[in-house]
Amino acid sequence: MKNIIITGGAGFIGSHVVRLFVNKYPEYHIINLDKLTYAGNLANLKDIEDKPNYTFVKGDICDFDLMLKLMQDYQVDDIIHLAAESHVDRSIKDPFTFAQTNVMGTLSLLQAAKIYWESLPEGYEGKRFYHISTDEVYGALQMTHPEGIPAPFTTKASSDKNHEAYGEEFFLETTKYNPHSPYSASKASSDHFVRAFHDTYGMPTIVTNCSNNYGPYQFPEKLIPLFINNIRHRKPLPVYGKGENVRDWLYVVDHARAIDMIFHKGKIAETYNIGGFNEWKNIDIIKVVIKTVDRLLGRPEGADLDLITYVTDRKGHDMRYAIDSRKLQKELGWEPSLQFEEGIEETVKWYLENQEWMDNVTSGDYQKYYDNMYSNR
């Protein structure tokens, strides 16, 4: 049996990866390692918690002694590393925590893996350290066509109504790093440490950089679940600046599928970009969410558009992200399975049908954070 640690497995993307691996590979023992910070929630994995090939361990990746003990106790063959502080707004207020978790936590995990794997007779043979990162490490692309031009490429994730790009450049695996926020700087540093462990010690590593994800179980500090919840309760929808910033959106289950494929078929020391060729201005995706929520709640279409409230822009707010994922499609055959409008429909339905989950994660400390972030802007 292969023993795999998945860090951050109680979080948004991590829980989808854990669920996929536990259900798809009964011959794998999946060890879900999560600190259970505000964004980690074991309720995300209730449906698999009793599976015989699943184990949960509460722990902090910054705890090197614990990481080494877990490697030894579970005889870990592979690591899929998703644990991270990931919200840009929080990184602006508390960059130290982001550096501690994302940089030092990754280094702790790398060093523990190095010590354990090098102690084995076979060394690194058959081992893999797969590090999941973000497109934000590349910086920002110019929005040379604010009115939109026909997208040069599409995937099934692309909108059937919005085949537009807002510039001619896209992030490639060879794009130079140029992080602009404390969050992206911390992720860029962790990416470099992972590659350095391959170049220096021969550790078998892979890095992937993904575009914005959406879907079930996302903590509602992020745009789509935040707005679904606010629309439901007819609360203001805080939009940074003019809402013109552009992001490439991918359904989280398709990201998990890509991680599965890259883990099994990806080449060691390679980087793969994961995206959907699905660019949207923030204001446009907000309007889609409003119309979808209103329709599913039986309200007149667009009845809640007046909830849009423009607030002071985020410091250092990157204008446009857009991923070119053709390398992954060409070399490994991955493509998204869900078209954008289908994904939004499924996402809105899930949050509306799981209000208890939303109520549980938006109580207490989250409410204090929300009030602090948006009440005075």
Residue ranges and their predicted role:
Residues 43, 142, 218, 250, ...:
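Short, well-ordered secondary-structure micro-motifs
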Residues 4, 17, 30, 59-62, ...:
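C-terminal substrate-binding subdomain of Rossmann-fold SDR/epimerase-dehydratase oxidoreductases
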Residues 36, 97, 212-215, 245-246, ...:
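Short histidine/acidic/glycine/proline-rich micro-motifs that form metal-
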Residues 179-186, 216, 220, 224, ...:
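The catalytic Tyr-centered alpha-helix of NAD(P)H-dependent dehydrogenases
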Residues 1-213, 263, 282, 346, ...:
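N-terminal Rossmann-like NAD(P)+-binding domain of SDR-like oxidoreductases, especially those catalyzing
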Residues 41-44, 94, 219-223, 285, ...:
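Residues at alpha-helix caps and immediate loop-helix transition turns in enzyme cores, especially N-
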Residues 74, 84-85, 170, 215-216, ...:
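Intrinsically disordered, low-complexity segments enriched in polar/charged residues with Gly/Pro
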